[in-house]
A protein has these predicted regions:
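Generic short beta-strand segments
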Residues: 59, 127-131, 165-167
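Surface-exposed short loop/turn segments
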Residues: 24-47, 105-157, 171
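Short secondary-structure boundary motifs at beta->alpha junctions and helix caps
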Residues: 77-86, 154-195
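A structural "domain/chain start" motif
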Residues: 22-92, 199-202
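Sec-dependent bacterial lipoprotein signal peptides
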Residues: 1-23
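Structured, soluble extracytoplasmic/luminal domains of envelope-associated proteins
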Residues: 85-107
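Sec-exported extracytoplasmic/periplasmic mature domains
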Residues: 100, 104-108, 190, 194-202
Length: 202
């Protein structure tokens, strides 16, 4: 092969590589998107005189959801997640933080801590069984399965406990809508939880 032929061959290979890169999106990559949960406007119980110190313990989560990727399912047998659509932080941390914000706004307790700092009067525990997008044919839903427990630190018997598991319809497969729907579900759960806690007299 002559020198001119070698140069031409290298040029053709380079152009082919550039064309393949453009075809497969190598030159322009989609950005990673991050989503979070927000506090909704809910009906708060009549707090009365705030008393006692509550610690919101670190929430736990089912092992399959221990990731920042937003999970979606198309059947009971599927378990998939988005590569570029992520929760801004671990879902159990987000849910615990938002739950703490609801409790602070309720005024039921004199103080609410999310970090251990001495022995509290009460503890709120949470476990997430599922936080996901559910796709069923042409319908989409957001699902949040969450167990909440209020107890005293020295007691194994809960003062109040309930497992919530509901879905809310969303209009499309858009993670932002899923985050909004899960926020609304969490708000609904916390409204019931705060009412029950207030009624139980803590």
């Amino acid at each position: 092969m002559t020198r001119a032929a070698k140069v031409l061959f290298v040029a053709i290979v380079a152009l082919a590589a550039m064309a393949l890169t453009a075809c497969f999106g190598g030159s322009t990559s989609e950005p990673t998107r991050y989503f979070t949960l927000a506090v909704e406007n809910i009906n708060m119980p009549n707090a009365g005189d705030a008393s006692g110190r509550l610690q919101v313990r670190k929430f736990t989560i089912d092992q399959a959801y221990q990731r920042n990727n937003i999970v979606y399912r198309e059947s009971a047998y599927d378990f998939m997640f988005y590569d570029l659509d992520l929760w801004a932080s671990r879902p159990e941390q987000m849910v615990a933080q938002v739950a703490a914000e609801y409790i602070v706004k309720s005024g039921l307790f004199a103080s609410v801590d999310t970090r251990a700092s001495g022995k509290p009067d009460f503890e709120l525990l949470g476990h997430i069984d599922a936080i996901e997008e559910v796709d069923e044919g042409s319908s989409q839903y957001a699902r949040l399965s969450l167990k909440l427990t209020l107890q005293k630190p020295d007691s194994d018997a809960p003062l109040w406990e309930k497992r919530f598991d509901e879905r809310q319809s969303v209009s499309s497969r858009e993670p932002r809508l899923v985050a909004e729907a899960i926020s609304k579900l969490l708000g609904k759960y916390m409204e019931e939880a705060l009412g029950a806690i207030a009624g139980a007299g803590k």
